[in-house]
Amino acid sequence: MSQTSLKKERDPSILILDFGSQYSELIARRIRETNVFSLVVSNCISIEEINDINPKGIILSGGPNSVYEKNAPKCDEKIFNLGIPILGICYGMQLMVKELGGSVTSATKKAEYGRAPINIDQESELLSDVEDKSIMWMSHGDSINCLPDGFNKIAHTENTLHAAISNDRKKLFGVQFHPEVIHSEFGITVIKNFVYGISSCVADWTTETYIEETIPRIRDQVGNKKVLLALSGGVDSSTLAFLLNKAIGNQLTCMFIDQGFMRKGEPEFLMNFFDKKFHIKVEYINARERFISKLKGITDPEQKRKIIGEEFIRVFEEESNRLGPFQYLAQGTLYPDVIESAGTNIDPKTGERIAVKIKSHHNVGGLPKDLQFKLVEPLRKLFKDEVRKLGAALGLPDEIIKRHPFPGPGLAIRILGEVNNEKLDCLRDADWIVRDEIKKAGLYNDIWQAFAVLLPVKTVGVMGDKRTYAWPIVLRCVSSEDGMTADWSKIPFPILERISNRIVNEVVSVNRVVYDITSKPPGTIEWE
């Protein structure tokens, strides 16, 4: 089927031009939370491309540069004459001011970082229902010195004269603060005012409409060809399996490679769930001994990751040739993966990477270029929280939708040092106890990750009046919104006590449990 015959994908209602901000992705997420579809695109997008998309509104993101610097990122200045509402955030506001004849200078002496109360100077549609003196999040070292003609100052702070500006006639607006950040008290109100009140968007980005639009596109793309999916049991690949099964049925084959590093009972649960309960075709590949033999004598974590990734490739290639031929490879690529791998080199029309290549999935580790698959990536425009909602709508249980993140190399990188079957059995039992007690306490859904780590040392203990010399287990529990930063979870002592007592009494070769109270940064969530 030719590419031109495929069903057209929906265009974003709001375009976000990325100038290098750490918050560009967050802006898109906040807008989607209001049920409006948005995409992050390059700041170099052409006027022709914008007109082709015909968005209802445009947001210019923040960025680390100063607009008065040589080679500072810009956009086509004709964008301000399209008649499309525009909101500039931080750098985006300063760029708009400079391009339209105003001036921006360094605010070294009055730089503003963190929380700051804003003072509203005059009524504006942008700041409707925003309380005066409310707290907004500032992060800037430059400030506006002079506004362009037609603009008004609508808010200020103690150190920033132009905290918000507007040109109502041209529907051009700017804020020096970051409304997308959770610390901004009325930030979501500002976003809704721009998206709904100013840009007249419609709340039509829902899980139901996504399913209705995506299934026909999958059928158009695939036709009657066969599709292969590497199933890990995580929320991404599981949701994708359900979506593809709904779209193309038995044209889908899932391959589950059991490398021996999964948590207790997971392989059995996944096979029973997908194959027996929902009758989704899953090929189970038992490669446990193959993987464990490759790690003999290996202690370096990066070597372990590399070996596991390379062996996965070999197994995947062998089994796909045996089971195939397959014309399509399905991947659980998400929108953050697209943004990260492409930077701002994203096709503004499709939201895809401009130079498409097979992505290094967390379980695949980079597939061979000569596999000659065409890609099916129906989740590539979704964020993680949207995938969870999609999974729920498709019938996935909470056991999968709300499961904690789990690294591709699995328990192999939660065993520090060399990996062997004895250590794997020990860690599986300890890890199961951790999660079991966290669930019994009703804390599982409040914690980002809770797991056990096995250290490559032994400690002295006393059990039954006898000296012991056994492994210590580290308990790692963290709270986070996205995994980028994390704080150690303040689990009540009685729960920690139960976990410790059970591990030292029920797990062979363990005589000590310690609790990791390190945040990220400076530490990472995983130990390896």
From Swiss-Prot:
Cysteine disulfide partners in this protein: none
Keywords: ATP-binding, Glutamine amidotransferase, GMP biosynthesis, Ligase, Nucleotide-binding, Purine biosynthesis
GO CC entries: cytosol
Gene3D superfamilies: 3.30.300.10, 3.40.50.880, HUPs (3.40.50.620)
Domain of life of the source: Bacteria
Domain annotation Glutamine amidotransferase type-1: ranges: 13-204
GO MF assignments: ATP binding; GMP synthase activity
Catalytically driven reaction(s): XMP + L-glutamine + ATP + H2O = GMP + L-glutamate + AMP + diphosphate + 2 H(+)
EC number: 6.3.5.2
InterPro entries assigned to the protein according to its UniProt record, in alphabetical order: Class_I_gatase-like, GATASE, GMP_synth_C, GMP_synth_GATase, GMP_synthase, GMPS_ATP_PPase_dom, Rossmann-like_a/b/a_fold
Annotated binding of ATP, by residue: S232, G233, G234, V235, D236, S237, S238
CDD domains hit by this protein: GATase1_GMP_Synthase (cd01742), GMP_synthase_C (cd01997)
Pathway: Purine metabolism; GMP biosynthesis; GMP from XMP (L-Gln route): step 1/1
Active-site annotation: C90 (nucleophile), H178, E180
Domain GMPS ATP-PPase: 205-403
Assembly with partners or alone: Homodimer.
Function, as annotated: Catalyzes the synthesis of GMP from XMP.
Protein name: GMP synthase [glutamine-hydrolyzing]
Gene: guaA
